[in-house]
C-alpha cells in the first residue's frame, strides 16, 4: 500500500475534528461541494473578519453585497461567455469527464498546461498515452466547455442567467454608485466577500477545487493620469 500523503492526512483530521466534510453524504455526496462544521465555520468567519479589518476598514474602503445570479448580458459584456472555458475530455468506456490539462499535469508533473493552448493539450494527451484514471479507458479528443452555472431567471423562464464565477463584475457594475458614495474622489475601492460558483468539470482535489465557495475580492479605482496613492508611504520600504 502506498504511503498516505501529508495532504490526505490533514484532510482526514480536518473532517474528523469538524472543520469540514463532504456535502450531501446521506445521498452519496457530490464532488465539488463541502459543508463547514463548527470549527470550520468559526475559522472561516475569523479569516473573513481579519481580511475586512486589514484591507477594508483600515483603508476606509467600501463594501458591497451583490446578487450571485446575474443576467446573461453581464457576462456577454465581460467576455466570460466567450472565455470562461476549460478543455474537457471524456472517457469512451465509462463516460466520466475530466479536465484535460489536469490529467496531463498529474501524469507528467508539468505546470500551467492550460496556458499552452488547445492544440498542445490535444497532442500531449496522445503523446503521453494518457487514459481514464477511473477505468483505464481511452479518452476522447478534448473540447472547450463553459464552466459557469446556467439558469433561468423567472419561474416561467423569462431570461437566461448565470451564477457569477467571481465577484469583480459586481464592483465594476456598481462603480458609479461607489464613486458617488466616495464623494466623487479617487482613489477609492469596492470590496466584497461573497459566494461564487464555478461548474468545474472534475473537482477531484478536495478543498482546492470547489463548485461553490467564498471569495474575497477588492477593486481599487484610481486616476491613471494622477496615480498617486495616499497609502504608498506605509509600505514603500517593504521588499517583495
Locate each region found by the language model.
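TRNA-recognition modules of translation machinery and tRNA-sensing kinases, especially anticodon-binding
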Residues: 2-240
Amino acid at each position: 500500500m502506498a504511503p498516505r500523503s501529508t495532504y490526505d492526512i490533514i484532510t482526514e483530521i480536518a473532517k474528523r475534528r469538524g472543520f469540514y466534510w463532504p456535502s450531501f453524504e446521506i445521498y452519496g455526496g457530490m464532488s465539488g461541494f463541502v459543508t463547514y462544521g463548527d470549527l470550520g465555520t468559526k475559522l472561516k468567519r475569523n479569516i473573513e473578519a481579519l481580511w475586512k479589518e486589514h484591507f477594508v476598514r483600515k483603508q476606509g474602503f467600501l463594501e458591497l453585497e451583490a446578487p450571485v445570479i446575474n443576467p446573461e448580458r453581464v457576462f456577454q459584456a465581460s467576455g466570460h461567455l466567450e472565455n470562461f472555458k476549460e478543455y474537457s475530455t471524456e472517457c469512451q468506456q465509462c463516460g466520466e469527464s475530466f479536465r484535460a490539462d489536469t490529467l496531463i499535469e498529474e501524469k507528467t508533473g508539468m505546470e500551467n498546461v492550460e496556458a499552452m493552448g488547445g492544440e498542445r493539450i490535444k497532442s500531449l494527451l496522445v503523446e503521453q498515452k494518457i487514459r481514464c484514471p477511473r477505468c483505464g479507458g481511452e479518452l476522447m479528443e478534448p473540447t472547450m466547455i463553459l464552466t459557469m452555472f446556467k439558469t433561468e431567471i423567472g419561474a416561467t423562464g423569462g431570461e437566461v442567467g448565470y451564477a457569477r464565477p467571481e465577484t469583480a463584475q459586481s464592483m465594476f457594475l456598481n462603480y458609479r454608485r461607489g464613486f458617488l458614495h466616495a464623494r466623487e474622489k479617487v482613489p477609492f475601492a469596492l470590496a466584497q466577500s461573497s459566494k461564487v460558483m464555478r461548474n468545474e468539470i472534475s473537482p477531484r482535489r478536495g478543498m482546492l477545487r470547489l463548485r461553490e465557495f467564498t471569495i474575497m475580492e477588492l477593486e481599487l479605482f484610481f486616476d491613471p493620469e494622477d496615480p498617486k496613492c495616499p497609502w504608498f508611504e506605509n509600505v514603500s520600504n517593504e521588499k517583495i
